[in-house]
Amino acid sequence: MSTGKVRADKDTLKAARVRLGLDQGQLAKAAGLTQVTISNFELGKTAPYDATQAAIQAALELRGIVFTNGDLPGFHFDKSKVVIPT
């Protein structure tokens, strides 16, 4: 069953992290993961579990990232969506 929520890929998640000015350690802490998990995911060394990917995406969304699925998958920053400032 689809929830209609956009599921971002590793490249989009990394770009969103960089856009927010977060390093891998900061994102890992925010998502409740390790820096090694973030690094391996971004490098494509491991495919994350759905829960891992969801935790990464949720941590970014709480900081104002809105993931989109138009012509190409992507994201934008929406200041009104910020729950946790970076």
Description of each model-found segment:
Residues 1-18, 68:
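A short, Lys/Arg-rich alpha-helix, primarily the initiator
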Residues 13, 24-28, 38-41:
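Conserved hydrophobic/aromatic packing and binding residues within compact polymer-binding modules
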Residues 19, 30:
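Residues within the alpha-helical elements of helix-turn-helix
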Residues 22, 33, 65:
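Short glycine/serine/threonine/alanine-rich loop segments
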Residues 32-48:
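Recognition helix of helix-turn-helix/homeodomain-like DNA-binding domains
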Residues 51-69:
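DNA major-groove recognition helix of helix-turn-helix/homeodomain DNA-binding modules
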Residues 65-86:
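Helix-turn-helix/homeodomain-like alpha-helical modules used for DNA recognition
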